[in-house]
Regions:
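Conserved catalytic submotifs in the C-terminal HATPase_c
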Residues: 35-50
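A conserved beta-strand-to-alpha-helix junction within the catalytic ATP-binding
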Residues: 9-22, 42
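Glycine-rich ATP-binding loops of the HATPase_c
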Residues: 144-151
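Short beta-strand-loop-beta element adjacent to the nucleotide/active-site pocket used for signaling
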Residues: 80-98
Length: 172
């Protein structure tokens, strides 16, 4: 594995999140059972949040994976409520945090404990490799010296939080 990414540069968190929304909304794969256009997107951005020094392509990949997972989980749950993804940015000490929260089926403690393990998946055979979240975990924790966490309970939706050092400071 390589060390710190060579493509670290300042980027506004809000711009990264908006790029992810744009990428997700143009993802019309008929094999997928969801239409991103049917999902309500709620934006809750902290206007005082400064730039992150990151590899924005890698962080976009992480967030896109989280957004797609949320969309898929909500569609497979057959919710009676309007599917909603809330994208929230906030500062936590020396970190800029991005939350991807859905109002989907949620997950139990066992699933939450295993969700970042390689090859662990809750998706149907053939529709997921179980690598997305383990790769995301590596990108956030190893490449960016940040943290990624999940909080969820069955029937209550899921929230993934990605926290990255502000100003390029290492979290080591």
């Amino acid at each position: 594995s390589r060390g710190a990414s060579a493509d670290m540069e300042p980027a506004r968190i809000e711009d990264i999140v908006e790029t992810v929304v744009r990428l997700a909304s143009t993802d019309y794969d008929l094999k997928k059972k969801y239409d991103f256009r049917q999902i309500e997107i709620v934006r809750d951005y902290d206007p005082g949040l400064e730039t992150l020094v990151c590899d924005h392509t890698e962080i976009e990949q992480v967030l896109l994976n989280l957004v797609k997972n949320a969309a898929q989980a909500m569609s497979e749950a057959g919710l009676s409520r309007t599917p909603r993804i809330t994208l929230r940015t906030r500062r936590a000490g020396e970190y800029g945090c991005i939350e991807v929260e859905d109002n989907g089926p949620g997950m139990d403690e066992h699933t939450q404990r295993r969700v970042f393990e390689p090859f662990f998946t809750t998706k149907a055979v053939g529709s997921g490799t179980g690598l997305g979240l383990s790769v995301s975990y590596f990108i956030v924790t190893e490449q960016h010296k940040g943290a990624i966490d999940v909080s969820s309970s069955p029937g209550e939706g899921t929230c993934f939080t990605v926290c990255l050092p502000l100003g390029g400071k290492s979290a080591r």
